[in-house]
Amino acid sequence: MTFESSFHKRNHYQWSIILILALLIIGLVLQFTVGSIPKAWFSFPYNIYTGLSFVLISTGLFWKFKNRELVNLLGGVPFALVVIIVLGILTIGLGSINLDHKIPEMAAEKGVHPTEMPHEHNPYLIQLGLKNITATWYFAFVFLGLLINLWFATLKRAIVFQAKNITFLLNHFGLWLCLFAGVLGQGDVQKLKMTLQQ
């Protein structure tokens, strides 16, 4: 059995889980060693360069290796299901952890506004990136897996263009475009705080 044949369709779920676990482990190692992804990477004009690079490189790899089982795996349903489940666990599970849950109570006791309270947290939770999960390496790698899956699935259907594929193409390309633009635009988002006096 060769390495290429081990990616056969009957093993797609198994390889999908292995790939996502590998991405999570690499992401966690990077998160604890390097820290979070700098916000400047997704600010203008770097987001344009990143977006164009992703589209050109992934499209080039797809066209060069479109008949390989690994490309079929990355653009297939098993990989999509695994990556969506893991992304859902990351966003709902880790995103619902509130590190500031005691701040309002402590602020009420001291008679100050919650935003004026000092934040003391477990340094490991901060290093894990729970204050801003979208800037963590492990989230970025899993999200990149979802973008690659949607892009490869769209390209696969676009090759054999038929009228019945139009809804599939619009649906998958639209979802890919929303996710892609949302991530690349997050570096330029500004959060402003306005205090109103009565």
Regions found by a protein language model. Name each.
Residues 1-198:
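Solvent-exposed, non-transmembrane regions of integral membrane proteins
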